Amino acid sequence: MFGQSSRFLTKLYRKVMKGKKVAFPFAYLNDLTSDLQSLRSDAQSVDDFLNIDLLERALALRALNLIQSTMADYDASNEPSKVKDNDVFYQAKVTMTRAHLKYLQFFLFRESYKNHSFLDNRIVSQLDTVSRIFCLSDLIEENSCGALFDTGFLQAGSLRFMNRALEKAVADLRPQMVPLAESLYLPDHWMISVIGNKEGDIYEMQLNEAMKTRLNKDEVPEYFERLMMPILRAKL
């Protein structure tokens, strides 16, 4: 999947660099031709890093910087294409593609609800909190926000504020976890869970599923009891 996504992303990059526009949901890639180094964030507090628009911009800029820098080095290399794809720039292309897909996940999720008419408008704020947690945790993970420091978009000390913002977002969401989890009606026969059914019959449910498995429908070879069971019992 990463290979296919990387090749498609490369095609989009080539298209943008030729002066052509790409459409939804890839429109953010049109900024590849702009000066990313000139963009600055004025975020200097925990509340600033809870601004969902700023977080969306941060995810986009991280992906743009990684794509721009990786493809510039890729095109400057004199190695054969296969060597560049499978060896020299393999990990760099995986990293840029992952950043691209993470942004698309965030963007498409937010697009799916921000203009939706909910019976209770308070749901939007809870989904915004989910989006904040997704974005902040991904930027903080393994310091993957390094591309944003590289462009100068984030100021020194931003990582500390991001960690505090993530803690606050998780604390805000915690009381809403059960309502969010139960907001969709998922019958037991549709979405089986290893933690049991809606009545909490965990072991009974697991036993029923195990008894219905196709492995129990075949005839057991006669040598299983004679040769295999002694070994299994010894290990037990």
Model-derived regions, located:
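Flavin-dependent oxidoreductase catalytic core characteristic
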Residues: M1-L236
